[in-house]
């Protein structure tokens, strides 16, 4: 088997860099954070510029954490300043370093998701000048994997120089710089980029390129901590590993070699993580068998569409019911646009922390409690599903979901998150071609709920009306035609129709 060479490229603080470029500012020296401050200071920042991160700010903080970190940093600067006094402030790191009497200031840029998508398309077009689409996997809006194997010999170039060529061309055309990782498999390329490159000193353009193979990975990173720095190891995985005395990738690799009679062996890992232990063990050794062609040929066994939103404030039960109704309407629209049907819809309701901090609500709740990622106690989410007829009109879906909502929701609690998903997707053409199989044991059949001719005509009329609505929205935008309920206080559809990924377009 031919040895492969993969390159992973991550655009540096992408959203923040784009906002700096659009303002004519240097992305590497400007203090800027991308956040919608209209959502209060609790809103999550989508990006923080590299210069602002230097003051102890993480990549995805909440806005109040940025405010606090800058305030603390300015207090230290004031203490060290001449006469313990700051005479002004600046948003530029270079000027700040040369002027001890200045304080730290920063720009707050509201998200512009459509602009970021446009920049991402421009970057991808640069890659396509050098690489075939079959050799590129778009991992996210700002990150790609490239199988560079066949290009290196043809161009008589090293992987490092090829990565630099791509990054510098992107920089020249868009102003956005990047970090790259090179590896003998996809996992090592990702780890080289995420861990090794980001610890390197950047060049004058902010570019970092790191390279790993299986042996150098074991030498450099078997003792690395924390485990959460590694791809696919989240807080839950790391906590479970550390609770069992496994703190590093080297620990996991050694554990996988243990004898059956020893406490630490691969059986321990399989008991902890099930079949996922196989991937964890491979990654501990720097092994990844998935190749680019495997990604391109992958087809999921079951397809689904998910809609989710975090409400800007805690909602009472009645108010959140309207949002569930709207989200189901939006889901029906997506199914129609994509010519799909489903036979099952799932609903998950996440509750707000105030449900447990307000005594008048807490006294009414006696259910399970979980701890969120910030260490706060939150009521256990409610979850349920309902079956629906394939091709059912929007009103049928909306009635089914609101009934499900009324069934599973705790009416005493405040709601913060809502997620719905359409399961078992199938193309309309496939559904229409399949004969409907009668089920003697179906509740609907037994209850005699087969539609009458008049009901069927009404349903077909509603479907035709919905098709017209879909056509109008596709031509003139999702807010071109709305339901009256979308204007009720607490409704979110009008606002969300102007968003991409839950943020301002």
Where are the regions a protein language model picked out?
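DNA-contacting surface of Y-family translesion DNA polymerases
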Residues: 8, 229, 237-415
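Short, charged/polar surface micro-motifs in flexible loops or helix N-caps
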Residues: 12-14, 38-42, 351-356, 425-428
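Gly/Gly-Pro- and Ser/Thr-rich, intrinsically disordered tail segments characteristic of DNA damage-repair
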Residues: 1-292, 447-505
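A glycine-rich phosphate-binding loop feature that marks nucleotide/adenosyl-phosphate handling sites
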Residues: 184-187, 282-284, 341-353, 414-427, ...
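Short, well-ordered secondary-structure micro-motifs
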Residues: 191-192, 357-360, 430-433
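Acidic, metal-coordinating catalytic segment for phosphate/diphosphate chemistry
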Residues: 18, 373-505
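Composition- and surface-driven signal marking solvent-exposed, interaction-prone regions
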Residues: 80, 343, 360-363, 433-437, ...
């Amino acid at each position: 088997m031919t040895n492969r060479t993969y390159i992973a490229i991550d655009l540096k603080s992408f959203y923040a860099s784009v906002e700096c470029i659009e303002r004519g500012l240097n992305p590497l020296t400007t203090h800027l954070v991308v956040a919608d401050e209209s959502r209060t200071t609790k809103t999550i920042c989508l990006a923080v510029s590299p210069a602002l991160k230097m003051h102890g700010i993480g990549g995805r903080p909440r806005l109040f954490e940025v405010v606090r970190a800058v305030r603390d940093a300015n207090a230290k600067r004031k203490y060290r300043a001449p006469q313990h006094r700051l005479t002004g402030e600046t948003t530029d790191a270079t000027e700040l370093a040369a002027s001890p009497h200045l304080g730290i200031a920063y720009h707050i840029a509201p998200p512009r998701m459509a602009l970021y998508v446009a920049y991402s398309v421009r970057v991808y077009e640069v890659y396509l000048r050098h690489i075939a689409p079959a050799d590129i996997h778009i991992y996210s809006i700002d990150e790609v994997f490239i199988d560079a194997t066949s290009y290196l010999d043809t161009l008589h170039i090293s992987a490092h120089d090829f990565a630099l060529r791509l990054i510098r061309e992107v920089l020249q055309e868009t102003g956005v710089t990047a970090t790259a990782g090179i590896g003998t498999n996809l996992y090592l390329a990702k780890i080289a980029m995420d861990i090794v490159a980001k610890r390197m000193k950047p060049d004058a353009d902010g570019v970092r390129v790191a390279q790993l193979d299986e042996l150098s990975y074991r030498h450099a990173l078997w003792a690395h901590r924390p485990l959460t720095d590694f791809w696919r190891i989240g807080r839950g995985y790391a906590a479970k590993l550390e609770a069992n005395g496994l703190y590093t990738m080297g620990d996991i690799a050694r554990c996988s070699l243990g004898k059956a009679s020893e406490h630490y062996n691969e059986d321990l890992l399989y008991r902890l993580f099930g079949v996922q232990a196989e991937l964890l063990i491979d990654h501990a050794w720097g092994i990844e068998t998935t190749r680019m062609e495997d990604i391109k040929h992958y087809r999921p066994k079951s397809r689904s569409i998910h809609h989710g939103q975090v409400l800007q404030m805690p909602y009472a039960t009645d108010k959140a019911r309207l949002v569930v109704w709207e989200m189901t309407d939006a889901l029906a629209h997506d199914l129609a646009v994509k010519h799909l049907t489903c036979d099952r819809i799932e609903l998950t309701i996440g509750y707000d922390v105030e449900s447990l901090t307000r005594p008048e609500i807490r006294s009414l709740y006696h259910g399970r409690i979980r701890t969120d990622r910030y260490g706060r106690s939150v009521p256990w989410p409610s979850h349920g599903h309902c079956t629906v007829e394939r091709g059912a009109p929007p009103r049928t879906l909306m009635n089914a979901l609101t009934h499900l909502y009324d069934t599973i929701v705790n009416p005493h609690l405040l709601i913060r998150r809502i997620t719905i998903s359409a399961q078992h997707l199938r193309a309309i053409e496939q559904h229409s071609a399949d004969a409907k199989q009668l089920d003697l044991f179906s509740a609907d059949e037994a209850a005699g709920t087969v539609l009458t001719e008049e009901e069927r005509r009404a349903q077909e009329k509603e479907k035709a009306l919905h098709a017209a609505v879909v056509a109008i929205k596709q031509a003139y935008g999702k807010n071109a035609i709305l339901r009256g309920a979308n204007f009720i206080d607490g409704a979110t559809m009008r606002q969300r129709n102007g968003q991409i990924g839950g943020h301002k377009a």
